Amino acid sequence: MQMINTVNESALVAELTELYMKYEAALCSNNTAVLDEFFWDSADVVRFGLKENQYGAEDIRVFRNSRPGFKLEREIINLKVVTFGQDSAAVTLEFRRFINGEQRFGRQSQMWMRFSEGWKVVSAHVSFL
């Protein structure tokens, strides 16, 4: 078994933070094509949403494309990127959104893995407090 002996290598944290901010921009503008590129194209990818669960890339695509075309803007309160070795990372986020004039706080967690085609989200969860 190969042990992970590098945590939070600064160059990887910067790379993943930059990628995450591109993901966030795509999410907030509801750019589904870009969002699809960030997720692992596999039947094994999982996304737990606010009111729904998706199992597999196709379920995630169907969900994203069925949402109304409104913007999902939110304020990032706390973003944490932790890398493990050269090829895996956890990205966690606390955020604030206004929905129908009501302030809501939420959180999101994602596991990212590096594949030959680049970094991909392999598991994601989002919820409100």
What are these regions (language model features)?
Residues 13, 32-85, 100-103:
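A solvent-exposed, acidic/Ser-Thr-rich amphipathic alpha-helical stretch
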Residues 97-99, 112:
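Beta-strand elements of well-folded, non-transmembrane domains
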Residues 85-95:
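A short hydrophobic beta-strand element
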Residues 1-38, 53:
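Short, low-complexity N-terminal intrinsically disordered segments enriched in polar/charged residues
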Residues 4-5, 76, 121:
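C-terminal-biased regions
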Residues 105-129:
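Short beta-strand edge/turn micro-motifs at domain boundaries
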Residues 39, 95-97, 125-128:
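Short beta-strand segments enriched in hydrophobic/aromatic residues
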